[in-house]
């Protein structure tokens, strides 16, 4: 896992060059927006159970076969595993948002996840739909202007959306 600063240093070192002005400017912009980033991560983390529960309710309403007898989320044990997996993915999205880098999510959460779900017979499209529903819920919370740092959060919301998109694509 590399945070944005470590990544810039590693790239400059690999080139055998000093850190460029444009790289410094990009990092400075990231620092100036850090309060918005912290607010967003805090909002997702503080509302994680609501985000997961809301997404699960919507998913099971859209795909009732998942909770019907024989479905992948039928029985309380399977339902708990489904909710746990959704929560884990959401947690790694927050790690990526916090660091501004998806590598920790890729390495520790998504790497091999599709193959695991295939081996278990879990429909990847349903998992991806659940991730997209979490994305919608999380972005709605992030974009709620009440009680957050002033300023435009469109770029940060877009960035966080890409982390959800990566997670959904990795299991679909």
Curated annotation (Swiss-Prot):
Keywords associated with the record: Antenna complex, Bile pigment, Chromophore, Electron transport, Membrane, Methylation, Photosynthesis, Phycobilisome, Thylakoid, Transport
Coiled coil: none
Keyword Transferase among record annotations: no
Binding site for (2R,3E)-phycoerythrobilin: 153
Transport in keyword set: yes
Record PTM text: Contains two covalently linked bilin chromophores.
Function description: Light-harvesting photosynthetic bile pigment-protein from the phycobiliprotein complex.
Subunit structure and binding partners: Heterodimer of an alpha and a beta chain.
Protein's UniProt name: R-phycocyanin-2 beta chain
Organism: Synechococcus sp. (strain WH8103)
Gene of this entry: rpcB
């Amino acid at each position: 896992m590399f945070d944005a600063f470590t990544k810039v240093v590693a790239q400059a070192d690999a080139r055998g060059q000093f850190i460029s002005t444009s790289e410094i400017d990009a990092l400075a912009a990231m620092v100036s927006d850090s309060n918005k980033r912290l607010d967003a991560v805090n909002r997702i983390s503080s509302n994680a159970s609501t985000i997961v529960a809301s997404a699960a309710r919507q998913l099971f309403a859209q795909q009732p076969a998942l909770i019907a007898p024989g479905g992948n989320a039928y029985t309380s044990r399977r339902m708990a595993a489904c909710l746990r997996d959704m929560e884990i993915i959401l947690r790694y999205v927050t790690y990526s948002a916090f660091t501004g880098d998806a590598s920790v999510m890729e390495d520790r959460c998504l790497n091999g996840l599709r193959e695991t779900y295939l081996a278990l017979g879990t429909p990847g499209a349903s998992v991806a739909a659940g991730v997209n529903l979490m994305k919608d819920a999380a972005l709605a919370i992030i974009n709620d202007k009440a009680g957050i740092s002033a300023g435009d959060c469109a770029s940060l919301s877009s960035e966080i959306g890409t982390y959800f998109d990566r997670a959904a694509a990795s299991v679909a």
